[in-house]
Amino acid sequence: MSGRGKQGGKVRAKAKSRSSRAGLQFPVGRVHRLLRKGNYAERVGAGAPVYMAAVLEYLTAEILELAGNAARDNKKTRIIPRHLQLAIRNDEELNKLLGKVTIAQGGVLPNIQAVLLPKKTESHKAKSK
C-alpha cells in the first residue's frame, strides 16, 4: 500500500456544456437528443444540433425583440400573444415563415378596405366660393 490516496491522480476538468462551448442559451444536448429520437435520420452529426440550436435561438430573439417593441407601443410591460401576432404579421420575412401558423389569442391585424372608407369631399369653405 502506498498510502497516497487520490493525491497523485490527474485532476479532471470541470464539465462544460455544449451550449456554453458554442456560446448559446438554447440546449444543444436536448436538441441533439430530439434529433436522434425524432427519426429524421439514422445518424446525427456533432455540428447539426449546435447549428440548429443557434438558428432556434436567433429566431426566438428576433420574434421577442419585435414583440417587445409592439408591447412598448401599446404602453404595456408584459408581452402577450397579441404582441407576438402583431410582431410576426408586420414583419415580411417572419410572416412568410409563419404564414400558416395560428397564434392562440392573437387576434387579427387591423385593416379596413379602402373601398369602405368614407369618400373625401370638398370642405364647406370650398363649396361656398
Curated annotation (Swiss-Prot):
The modification N5-methylglutamine is found at residue 105. It comes from the Eukaryota. Residues 7-19 have a biased composition (Basic residues). It is found in: Nucleus; Chromosome. Disulfide bonds: none annotated. One of its GO terms (cellular component) is nucleus. The keyword Kinase does not apply. There is a cross-link at residues 14, 16, 120 (Glycyl lysine isopeptide (Lys-Gly) (interchain with G-Cter in ubiquitin)). The modification N-acetylserine is found at residue 2. One of its GO terms (biological process) is heterochromatin formation. Keywords: Acetylation, Chromosome, DNA-binding, Isopeptide bond, Methylation, Nucleosome core, Nucleus, Phosphoprotein, Ubl conjugation. The modification N6-lactoyllysine is found at residue 10. Residues 1-22 are annotated as: Disordered. It holds the Pfam family Histone. The keyword Electron transport does not apply. Its main location: nucleus. One of its GO terms (molecular function) is DNA binding. The modification N6-acetyllysine is found at residue 6. Belongs to the histone H2A family. Core component of nucleosome. Nucleosomes wrap and compact DNA into chromatin, limiting DNA accessibility to the cellular machineries which require DNA as a template. Histones thereby play a central role in transcription regulation, DNA repair, DNA replication and chromosomal stability. DNA accessibility is regulated via a complex set of post-translational modifications of histones, also called histone code, and nucleosome remodeling. The nucleosome is a histone octamer containing two molecules each of H2A, H2B, H3 and H4 assembled in one H3-H4 heterotetramer and two H2A-H2B heterodimers. The octamer wraps approximately 147 bp of DNA. This is Histone H2A.J. It comes from Gallus gallus. The lineage of its organism: Eukaryota, Metazoa, Chordata, Craniata, Vertebrata. The gene is H2A-IX.
